[in-house]
């Protein structure tokens, strides 16, 4: 690679690397059998046709900010692109866990496979088949992430430096998901535990670890890595808090997900925990309604009622203040890093985009 891609060019460059990787796997997949080829086509569509490439972009930013070291930019781009397969695994499995029907405005993988089963008039239960295939497709995505990362062309020294963030990121996102569903099962109302989910399921995995990974590959100092991790922690949690707001109040035409999806699924978010605390003090009847219906209704009118109770509690305004505070704190960590002004400006823009988004 003669030209070093700018951060704005990374999403397109990542897509090209993923397409090349999948092309290189076609023969092996075809040898196994036509059903596998068809299953992999769902993964291919998922990773190529959607997504903002947030994680590869942050990994590339960490690499540039640390001065790139002696690593081949092409190898670094492949390593960054591999993060999209981890994201695919996480989302495909997350959609199964949440029984979601849509993702990015399209059918989720398990629903798409379920439709294939019906149209092909296969034997057995279509829903069970769709879930089973989607689990395996998600597993394959995780395998592909490891293959693409290890075969990226990075030096042995760079792979060694990357070992801690690479391992930590995968453990943290799975641990965060486990914590998430455990809180739902327990009906948790803890703000602190909801924040732990935000920390591990989103912040570390979406921003903090990708930045850490890119910087480590380039041989960054411990001081720079610490500054990046501080930025990633704060902006990542703010990103998830914004997601929680959209999960209750977002426009389906913009988000690509049904209105009130988090309420239907019973997500134990910081927004819900705060709303319950405030409603307990100001309107116990409303608090009782929240406890009774969250996670137990799909009725649009009841979901709208729950959203109104949360809005009336004042919790959304408190979440907005927290988003603003975390964004400012994250930017302070970034400015303390004193890296290339162009990279700093881009990371500032990414922070604002992540925390002020509407989808």
Residue map of PLM features:
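Conserved N-terminal diphosphate/IPP-binding helix and adjacent helical/loop segment
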Residues: 1-83, 88, 92, 97-127, ...
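Acidic, Mg2+-coordinating active-site segments of isoprenoid diphosphate-utilizing enzymes
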Residues: 64-66, 92-122, 146, 173-191, ...
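Alpha-helical scaffolds flanking conserved acidic
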Residues: 71-86, 131, 159-165, 224-235, ...
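A glycine/threonine-rich phosphate-anchoring loop and its flanking beta-alpha core
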Residues: 121, 125-154
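A short glycine-threonine-serine/GTX helix/turn-capping micro-motif
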Residues: 130-136, 192-202
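Transmembrane helix-loop-helix
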Residues: 149-164, 287-292
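Conserved ATP-utilizing enzyme core subdomain
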Residues: 161-175
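Short hairpin/turn module used for nucleic-acid contact or packing/dimerization
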Residues: 304-359
